[in-house]
Amino acid sequence: MARRSVLYFILLNALINKGQACFCDHYAWTQWTSCSKTCNSGTQSRHRQIVVDKYYQENFCEQICSKQETRECNWQRCPINCLLGDFGPWSDCDPCVEKQSKVRSVLRPSQFGGQPCTEPLVAFQPCIPSKLCKIEEADCKNKFRCDSGRCIARKLECNGENDCGDNSDERDCGRTKAVCTRKYNPIPSVQLMGNGFHFLAGEPRGEVLDNSFTGGICKTVKSSRTSNPYRVPANLENVGFEVQTAEDDLKTDFYKDLTSLGHNENQQGSFSSQGGSSFSVPIFYSSKRSENINHNSAFKQAIQASHKKDSSFIRIHKVMKVLNFTTKAKDLHLSDVFLKALNHLPLEYNSALYSRIFDDFGTHYFTSGSLGGVYDLLYQFSSEELKNSGLTEEEAKHCVRIETKKRVLFVKKTKVEHRCTTNKLSEKHEGSFIQGAEKSISLIRGGRSEYAAALAWEKGSSGLEEKTFSEWLESVKENPAVIDFELAPIVDLVRNIPCAVTKRNNLRKALQEYAAKFDPCQCAPCPNNGRPTLSGTECLCVCQSGTYGENCEKQSPDYKSNAVDGHWGCWSSWSTCDATYKRSRTRECNNPVPQRGGKRCEGEKRQEEDCTFSIMENNGQPCINDDEEMKEVDLPEIEADSGCPQPVPPENGFIRNEKQLYSVGEDVEISCLTGFETVGYQYFRCLPDGTWRQGDVECQRRECIKPVVQEVLTITPFQRLYRIGESIELTCPKGFVVAGPSRYTCQGNSWTPPISNSLTCEKDTLTKLRGHCQLGQKQSGSECICMSPEEDCSHHSEDLCVFDTDSNDYFTSPACKFLAEKCLNNQQLHFLHIGSCQDGHQLEWGLERTRLSSNSTKKESCGYDTCYDWEKCSASTSKCVCLLPPQCFKGGNQLYCVKMGSSTSEKTLNICEVGTIRCANRKMEILHPGKCLA
């Protein structure tokens, strides 16, 4: 053995001496340079201090040692400070509330640790109105009017109960008749069922339904916990008491990251109103189908905890119900405070005043649900420690459930699994798997706050006392929360008040604007595919599994993905109403765009809705009450002994002097809608037999409607209607070209050529192929060579009108093919104009210009074209622009004898002057080349 070791040492020493290598650290590094950026990933470098000495040369240090190193630095994102816009002008003084307001918007939320916005966004001030308030008192008809203006049934007057809310229905009553034979207590916490709910904040708001109102009906319900029944309010359809505390309904969920815990911001839910209409709002609330904490403080706390390390989460929750309830579908009694707020809304739309309704009362109300409590904890675990524990996700969930049953609920005969106490994570904490968690976030709802706080787990705590959970459970019965609920829009409650229809429409408009303020589209993209979420005026980053850090900028060692999922940018403003009386808005999947295999945005890219407009003179918002909201319906037919019923007008036409019945011999006039014109005889005459004498008449379109194209395309000029002969140009973003013709002309009632619905943009391969070369050339290594018309021009390029001097004919050619052939010294091809060849002045001038060009002394390349003596090249458009005659040079060899206009005299002009006059389309006859003889 010793001999073998000596032999090994001798061989090793011989090898080292034979191939000596450079010890690079013999030459020290300089200090790292300053970072090139203070944030957003800069670079810094250092250099090796080389001394070219004998050692350096003999040991091949030049080949072995690296001389410079570079590394990333300051990779944290630059802070984005919150930015507010300027206040707009004061609104008009509203005559109904005698207030005016001014608003400003959040131009940019804070992000990545930037300064937050703390200043108010709305300012109000009292004012003296110059107009009269159009809001009239509600007509109670045969009902009793309360002092507050509320209308209630006559039978509720003098019944010993405060049905008006201001006790005006019990004033000056002689004798009262009680509704119930005895007094009943209200259902405990019944007022919670009448609260509004803010779907964006995920929390209850002010009272919208008055659940102390019983409507003169003595309806009771009994609980198994008490001997005395409770009085059921008029707003509730039914109530059922129950207490659910089953031990086997403890549920656990595993989350690799928080993105799946909060709802996707693109999800939409449609809420139908009682009036039959519906509108869509984002779902950010908890219901029977979804549990979401996206916008409350607990979710923010969870996000901040996940920033500290790569984390996974286990959520354990249990629902305890005290009672279930269902709200009536109609005839709901509003709370006094909500009714007063609605009555004080102005008639004219004011975004600031209408938005306050949602701040104070939420956006929805409860249509059904339960009162009770939810035991709900979210445990944060280190992803690395969970992985090293050896447990699967299902096993980890099971261990949390078992330990909660034993140490929180104190369920007897709980069998503890061996793997839950002997895994690597539990062994560090005396057999407790939960003690291995980094943190817990309490999502507990219901019960007394001190008992709920006692249930929250803290790292290193000794555990709960046996009575803690049972004390909280008992307190839930007295202090419940609304859980497992369903919602309807608060706008549906705005009924049976003065100007109800007008105010409902204003609230719907305000809700759309209000919801847009909570859209995370305003946030900048988060690093490592994090999902941005907007909390107030601050953007937070929800980290994907395998990432962490204040802004998700750090990666765990096993994080390999570099995909970037797409997120929606913000919606554009609504377009103006087009000829079909619709308007639209769009958004782009560009915040960021999907990259490296990332997911595309889900949801609609374009929204369209009908326009609302008035056919009468605009004198401000009309006061429309519920009973005045009429729609156009077919009027009942009127029977008469003589005359003619209303005739049917042609498509896209209407009767100017419209009525139900016309006398014998009376004429009606047919008119056409905007954009159409009458063709034929436009008068009908009523005959004695009750029929109409009418000739052929129709409404033909005399304008083209703005075409519907893909959102990526831009239409220039952008108009609602285009007259016959007008053209549009379709363009794409930089780096893309239209995958088809780009120029279209309105001819008759349609576009020529027809515009395909599938027309879109494609990558500008021509520009990419060209590189830094001239038009018609492509880059081949460091050289520029001519493109091949056959190989390089298979993709679409715009049409050009081209003249071939060999065949003495003109034709339409793709731009790529024309440029390639021109580059290959095909001099017989001449550019005439952009677009397909069509008869007209543009083609005539192009042909004449080509004939003149043969004598031009100047030939300057300019885009597709070549500029001649009478032209200059525009740097901004790459097109030839004609000079004015005074700008031409004097004299020259190329002279012409011409006659100007109707003049009989002859005049000698040079080629530049001739070209400028013909370019201006002025009349001129060329008599012969050369000077005039006389």
Swiss-Prot record:
Transmembrane segments: 278-290, 402-415
Biological processes per GO annotation: complement activation; complement activation, classical pathway; innate immune response; killing of cells of another organism
Domain LDL-receptor class A: 138-175
EGF-like domain ranges (all copies): 523-553
Subcellular location per the Swiss-Prot or TrEMBL entry: Secreted; Target cell membrane
Positions annotated to bind Ca(2+): L156, N159, E161, D163, D169, E170
SMART domains: CCP, FIMAC, LDLa, MACPF, TSP1
Gene3D superfamilies given in the database record: 3.30.60.30, Complement Module, domain 1, Low-density Lipoprotein Receptor, Thrombospondin type-1 (TSP1) repeat
Main location as per UniProt: secreted
Glycosylation sites per record: W29, W32, T38, W90, N324, T392, W568, W571, W574, N855
Region of interest (Factor I module (FIM) 2), ranges: 858-934
Domain of life: Eukaryota
Region (CCP 1): 611-688
Signal peptide from the UniProt entry: 1-21
Post-translational modification (record): All cysteine residues are assumed to be cross-linked to one another. Individual modules containing an even number of conserved cysteine residues are supposed to have disulfide linkages only within the same module.
Positions of the MACPF domain: 176-522
SUPFAM superfamilies attached to this UniProt entry: Complement control module/SCR domain, LDL receptor-like module, TSP-1 type 1 repeat
Annotated stretches, region: C5b-binding domain: 642-934
Boundaries of every Kazal-like domain copy: 780-839, 876-934
Subunit details: Component of the membrane attack complex (MAC), composed of complement C5b, C6, C7, C8A, C8B, C8G and multiple copies of the pore-forming subunit C9.
Function: Component of the membrane attack complex (MAC), a multiprotein complex activated by the complement cascade, which inserts into a target cell membrane and forms a pore, leading to target cell membrane rupture and cell lysis. The MAC is initiated by proteolytic cleavage of C5 into complement C5b in response to the classical, alternative, lectin and GZMK complement pathways. The complement pathways consist in a cascade of proteins that leads to phagocytosis and breakdown of pathogens and signaling that strengthens the adaptive immune system.
Name of the featured protein: Complement component C6
Name of the gene: C6
